[in-house]
Protein backbone atom coordinates (compact mmCIF):
# COMPACT_ATOMS: atom_id res chain seq x y z
CA UNK A 1 0.00 0.00 0.00
CA UNK A 2 1.38 3.39 -1.02
CA UNK A 3 0.53 7.03 -0.34
CA UNK A 4 0.70 8.97 -3.63
CA UNK A 5 0.71 12.78 -3.72
CA UNK A 6 -0.48 13.97 -7.12
CA UNK A 7 1.48 16.52 -9.12
CA UNK A 8 -0.21 19.97 -9.33
CA UNK A 9 -1.08 19.71 -13.01
CA UNK A 10 -4.35 21.57 -12.29
CA UNK A 11 -5.94 23.29 -9.28
CA UNK A 12 -8.10 20.22 -8.72
CA UNK A 13 -5.06 17.90 -8.59
CA UNK A 14 -2.81 20.11 -6.47
CA UNK A 15 -3.97 18.84 -3.06
CA UNK A 16 -4.97 15.26 -3.97
CA UNK A 17 -3.38 12.50 -1.89
CA UNK A 18 -4.32 8.95 -2.89
CA UNK A 19 -3.98 5.62 -1.10
CA UNK A 20 -2.96 3.06 -3.73
CA UNK A 21 -3.27 -0.65 -2.97
CA UNK A 22 -1.90 -2.87 -5.72
CA UNK A 23 -3.47 -5.95 -4.09
CA UNK A 24 -7.06 -4.85 -4.77
CA UNK A 25 -9.05 -6.67 -7.46
CA UNK A 26 -9.28 -4.57 -10.64
CA UNK A 27 -12.27 -6.34 -12.19
CA UNK A 28 -15.98 -6.37 -11.42
CA UNK A 29 -17.38 -7.47 -8.03
CA UNK A 30 -18.96 -10.90 -7.45
CA UNK A 31 -22.46 -10.45 -8.93
CA UNK A 32 -24.48 -12.89 -6.73
CA UNK A 33 -23.53 -10.82 -3.66
CA UNK A 34 -24.68 -7.48 -5.08
CA UNK A 35 -27.94 -5.71 -4.29
CA UNK A 36 -29.62 -2.58 -5.58
CA UNK A 37 -28.68 0.55 -3.66
CA UNK A 38 -31.19 3.30 -4.43
CA UNK A 39 -30.60 6.96 -3.67
CA UNK A 40 -33.09 9.13 -1.82
CA UNK A 41 -31.20 12.40 -1.54
CA UNK A 42 -31.66 12.37 2.22
CA UNK A 43 -35.47 12.55 1.86
CA UNK A 44 -38.05 10.39 3.61
CA UNK A 45 -41.33 9.04 2.20
CA UNK A 46 -42.87 12.52 2.56
CA UNK A 47 -40.16 14.07 0.41
CA UNK A 48 -38.74 16.04 3.32
CA UNK A 49 -35.03 16.25 4.08
CA UNK A 50 -34.32 14.10 7.13
CA UNK A 51 -30.53 13.88 6.64
CA UNK A 52 -28.68 16.95 5.41
CA UNK A 53 -25.72 17.03 3.00
CA UNK A 54 -26.80 13.99 0.94
CA UNK A 55 -27.46 14.02 -2.80
CA UNK A 56 -26.00 13.08 -6.17
CA UNK A 57 -23.01 10.80 -6.28
CA UNK A 58 -22.00 7.94 -8.52
CA UNK A 59 -24.26 4.92 -8.82
CA UNK A 60 -23.09 1.78 -7.08
CA UNK A 61 -24.37 -1.55 -5.83
CA UNK A 62 -24.47 -2.65 -2.21
CA UNK A 63 -22.09 -5.50 -1.40
CA UNK A 64 -23.72 -8.02 0.98
CA UNK A 65 -21.22 -8.42 3.82
CA UNK A 66 -21.24 -11.37 6.22
CA UNK A 67 -21.05 -9.66 9.61
CA UNK A 68 -22.33 -12.74 11.49
CA UNK A 69 -19.61 -15.23 10.46
CA UNK A 70 -21.66 -18.23 11.63
CA UNK A 71 -20.40 -20.77 9.08
CA UNK A 72 -18.53 -22.77 11.71
CA UNK A 73 -15.99 -25.51 11.16
CA UNK A 74 -15.68 -24.94 7.40
CA UNK A 75 -12.39 -23.35 6.32
CA UNK A 76 -12.51 -20.59 3.72
CA UNK A 77 -9.82 -19.35 1.35
CA UNK A 78 -9.45 -15.64 0.64
CA UNK A 79 -9.82 -15.32 -3.13
CA UNK A 80 -9.22 -11.58 -3.48
CA UNK A 81 -9.46 -8.18 -1.81
CA UNK A 82 -11.85 -5.60 -3.26
CA UNK A 83 -12.72 -1.92 -2.96
CA UNK A 84 -16.15 -1.24 -1.47
CA UNK A 85 -17.76 2.16 -2.22
CA UNK A 86 -20.13 1.75 0.75
CA UNK A 87 -17.48 1.82 3.51
CA UNK A 88 -13.97 2.97 4.33
CA UNK A 89 -12.68 -0.57 4.82
CA UNK A 90 -11.80 -2.93 1.99
CA UNK A 91 -13.61 -6.25 1.70
CA UNK A 92 -12.43 -9.79 1.00
CA UNK A 93 -14.18 -12.41 -1.13
CA UNK A 94 -13.78 -15.79 0.56
CA UNK A 95 -14.52 -19.25 -0.86
CA UNK A 96 -15.66 -21.90 1.63
CA UNK A 97 -14.81 -25.58 1.21
CA UNK A 98 -18.45 -26.33 0.38
CA UNK A 99 -18.34 -23.93 -2.59
CA UNK A 100 -20.15 -20.93 -1.08
CA UNK A 101 -18.66 -17.46 -1.49
CA UNK A 102 -19.14 -14.58 0.93
CA UNK A 103 -17.81 -11.09 1.45
CA UNK A 104 -16.20 -10.20 4.78
CA UNK A 105 -14.38 -7.13 6.08
CA UNK A 106 -10.74 -7.42 5.05
CA UNK A 107 -8.61 -7.68 8.23
CA UNK A 108 -5.14 -6.15 8.40
CA UNK A 109 -2.48 -8.56 7.17
CA UNK A 110 -4.87 -10.95 5.42
CA UNK A 111 -4.03 -11.47 1.73
CA UNK A 112 -5.30 -13.62 -1.13
CA UNK A 113 -4.63 -17.29 -0.48
CA UNK A 114 -4.94 -17.13 3.31
CA UNK A 115 -7.27 -19.60 5.05
CA UNK A 116 -9.73 -18.35 7.67
CA UNK A 117 -12.47 -20.02 9.69
CA UNK A 118 -15.13 -19.43 12.34
CA UNK A 119 -16.25 -21.26 15.46
CA UNK A 120 -15.18 -22.05 19.01
CA UNK A 121 -12.29 -24.21 17.79
CA UNK A 122 -10.85 -21.65 15.36
CA UNK A 123 -7.20 -20.73 16.09
CA UNK A 124 -6.36 -17.24 17.38
CA UNK A 125 -5.31 -15.79 14.04
CA UNK A 126 -6.17 -12.62 12.12
CA UNK A 127 -9.44 -13.05 10.23
CA UNK A 128 -10.82 -15.89 12.36
CA UNK A 129 -14.10 -15.35 14.25
CA UNK A 130 -14.83 -16.79 17.70
CA UNK A 131 -17.14 -16.16 20.64
CA UNK A 132 -15.41 -13.63 22.89
CA UNK A 133 -15.37 -16.10 25.79
CA UNK A 134 -12.85 -18.10 23.73
CA UNK A 135 -10.61 -15.13 22.87
CA UNK A 136 -7.67 -14.44 25.24
CA UNK A 137 -7.70 -11.25 27.30
CA UNK A 138 -5.50 -8.61 25.67
CA UNK A 139 -6.38 -9.66 22.12
CA UNK A 140 -7.20 -7.09 19.45
CA UNK A 141 -10.54 -7.72 17.72
CA UNK A 142 -12.95 -6.06 15.32
CA UNK A 143 -16.52 -6.58 14.04
CA UNK A 144 -17.74 -7.01 17.62
CA UNK A 145 -21.30 -8.17 18.32
CA UNK A 146 -23.38 -6.22 20.83
CA UNK A 147 -26.14 -8.82 20.71
CA UNK A 148 -25.17 -12.48 20.09
CA UNK A 149 -26.31 -13.62 16.66
CA UNK A 150 -27.14 -10.15 15.36
CA UNK A 151 -23.82 -9.62 13.60
CA UNK A 152 -20.89 -7.36 14.33
CA UNK A 153 -21.68 -3.70 15.02
CA UNK A 154 -18.57 -2.25 16.68
CA UNK A 155 -15.14 -1.56 15.13
CA UNK A 156 -15.99 -2.02 11.46
CA UNK A 157 -14.45 1.01 9.72
CA UNK A 158 -10.95 1.20 8.22
CA UNK A 159 -8.22 0.72 10.80
CA UNK A 160 -10.70 0.18 13.64
CA UNK A 161 -10.23 -2.30 16.46
CA UNK A 162 -11.21 -3.02 20.06
CA UNK A 163 -9.19 -4.69 22.79
CA UNK A 164 -10.50 -7.27 25.24
CA UNK A 165 -9.27 -6.07 28.65
CA UNK A 166 -11.22 -8.25 31.11
CA UNK A 167 -13.61 -11.18 31.42
CA UNK A 168 -16.19 -11.40 34.20
CA UNK A 169 -18.88 -14.09 34.13
CA UNK A 170 -21.25 -13.61 31.21
CA UNK A 171 -19.56 -10.38 30.09
CA UNK A 172 -16.24 -9.25 28.68
CA UNK A 173 -14.96 -5.69 28.90
CA UNK A 174 -13.60 -4.14 25.72
CA UNK A 175 -11.73 -0.91 25.12
CA UNK A 176 -12.75 0.97 21.96
CA UNK A 177 -10.62 3.34 19.89
CA UNK A 178 -12.49 6.29 21.38
CA UNK A 179 -11.23 5.32 24.84
CA UNK A 180 -14.65 4.08 25.96
CA UNK A 181 -14.66 0.86 27.95
CA UNK A 182 -17.88 -1.13 27.91
CA UNK A 183 -19.21 -4.57 28.72
CA UNK A 184 -20.57 -6.89 26.04
CA UNK A 185 -21.91 -10.43 26.32
CA UNK A 186 -19.15 -13.03 26.11
CA UNK A 187 -21.34 -15.21 23.86
CA UNK A 188 -21.12 -12.51 21.18
CA UNK A 189 -18.62 -13.03 18.40
CA UNK A 190 -15.68 -10.94 17.28
CA UNK A 191 -13.03 -11.29 14.60
CA UNK A 192 -9.34 -11.44 15.52
CA UNK A 193 -7.14 -8.53 14.43
CA UNK A 194 -7.96 -5.04 13.24
CA UNK A 195 -9.70 -3.85 10.11
CA UNK A 196 -7.34 -3.20 7.21
CA UNK A 197 -6.87 -0.08 5.08
CA UNK A 198 -5.78 1.99 8.08
CA UNK A 199 -4.13 4.49 5.67
CA UNK A 200 -7.63 5.60 4.63
CA UNK A 201 -7.36 8.53 7.06
CA UNK A 202 -4.33 9.89 5.16
CA UNK A 203 -6.14 10.47 1.87
CA UNK A 204 -7.05 13.97 0.69
CA UNK A 205 -9.90 14.38 -1.78
CA UNK A 206 -8.34 17.61 -3.03
CA UNK A 207 -11.46 19.32 -4.37
CA UNK A 208 -15.15 19.78 -3.68
CA UNK A 209 -16.13 17.73 -6.71
CA UNK A 210 -14.57 14.60 -5.22
CA UNK A 211 -17.00 14.88 -2.30
CA UNK A 212 -19.88 15.31 -4.76
CA UNK A 213 -18.85 12.09 -6.52
CA UNK A 214 -19.35 10.38 -3.17
CA UNK A 215 -22.82 11.84 -2.72
CA UNK A 216 -21.86 14.47 -0.14
CA UNK A 217 -23.33 17.96 -0.57
CA UNK A 218 -21.91 21.18 0.91
CA UNK A 219 -22.36 22.27 4.52
CA UNK A 220 -23.66 25.85 4.84
CA UNK A 221 -22.92 27.84 8.01
CA UNK A 222 -25.92 28.98 10.02
CA UNK A 223 -24.68 32.58 10.35
CA UNK A 224 -24.99 33.14 6.59
CA UNK A 225 -28.62 31.91 6.48
CA UNK A 226 -31.82 33.83 7.02
CA UNK A 227 -33.60 33.75 10.41
CA UNK A 228 -36.27 31.44 8.99
CA UNK A 229 -33.62 28.82 8.20
CA UNK A 230 -31.36 28.85 11.27
CA UNK A 231 -31.24 30.32 14.80
CA UNK A 232 -27.92 32.01 13.90
CA UNK A 233 -29.34 33.58 10.75
CA UNK A 234 -30.14 37.20 9.96
CA UNK A 235 -28.63 40.44 11.18
CA UNK A 236 -27.25 43.42 9.29
CA UNK A 237 -23.92 42.59 7.68
CA UNK A 238 -21.67 39.93 9.11
CA UNK A 239 -22.64 38.75 12.58
CA UNK A 240 -21.35 36.20 15.06
CA UNK A 241 -24.76 34.58 15.55
CA UNK A 242 -25.51 36.38 18.79
CA UNK A 243 -25.88 33.30 20.98
CA UNK A 244 -24.15 30.13 22.02
CA UNK A 245 -23.79 27.72 19.07
CA UNK A 246 -26.89 25.64 18.35
CA UNK A 247 -28.04 23.25 15.66
CA UNK A 248 -30.65 24.30 13.04
CA UNK A 249 -33.29 22.98 15.47
CA UNK A 250 -32.04 24.96 18.47
CA UNK A 251 -30.18 22.15 20.25
CA UNK A 252 -26.95 23.38 21.95
CA UNK A 253 -23.86 22.03 20.23
CA UNK A 254 -20.09 22.02 20.81
CA UNK A 255 -19.91 19.94 23.97
CA UNK A 256 -23.56 19.63 24.94
CA UNK A 257 -24.37 16.01 25.88
CA UNK A 258 -27.20 14.52 23.84
CA UNK A 259 -27.04 10.85 24.87
CA UNK A 260 -30.54 9.75 25.98
CA UNK A 261 -30.30 5.96 26.23
CA UNK A 262 -29.98 5.51 30.01
CA UNK A 263 -30.98 1.85 29.71
CA UNK A 264 -27.49 0.89 28.52
CA UNK A 265 -25.52 3.19 30.83
CA UNK A 266 -24.82 0.24 33.13
CA UNK A 267 -22.74 -1.42 30.40
CA UNK A 268 -20.43 1.58 29.97
CA UNK A 269 -17.52 1.20 32.39
CA UNK A 270 -15.76 4.39 31.32
CA UNK A 271 -16.93 7.13 28.97
CA UNK A 272 -14.98 7.96 25.86
CA UNK A 273 -12.08 10.41 25.89
CA UNK A 274 -12.89 14.02 25.07
UniProtKB/Swiss-Prot annotation:
Show the ranges annotated as biased composition (Basic residues): 256-265
Task: Name the source organism.
Answer: Vibrio parahaemolyticus serotype O3:K6 (strain RIMD 2210633)
**Keywords on record:** Ribonucleoprotein, Ribosomal protein, RNA-binding, rRNA-binding
Gene3D superfamilies given in the database record: 2.30.30.30, Nucleic acid-binding proteins, Ribosomal protein L2, domain 3
To which protein family does this belong? Belongs to the universal ribosomal protein uL2 family.
Q: Name one GO molecular function term.
A: structural constituent of ribosome
Record protein name field: Large ribosomal subunit protein uL2
Q: What's the gene?
A: rplB
Q: Which HAMAP family match?
A: Ribosomal_uL2_B
* Superkingdom classification of source: Bacteria
Amino acid sequence: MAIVKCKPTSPGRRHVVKVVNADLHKGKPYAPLLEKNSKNGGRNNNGRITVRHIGGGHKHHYRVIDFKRTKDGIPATVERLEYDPNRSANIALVLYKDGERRYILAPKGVVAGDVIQSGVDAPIKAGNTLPMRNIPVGSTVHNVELKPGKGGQLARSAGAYAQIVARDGAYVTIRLRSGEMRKVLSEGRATIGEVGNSEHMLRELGKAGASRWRGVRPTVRGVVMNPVDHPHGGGEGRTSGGRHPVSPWGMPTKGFKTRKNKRTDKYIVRRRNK
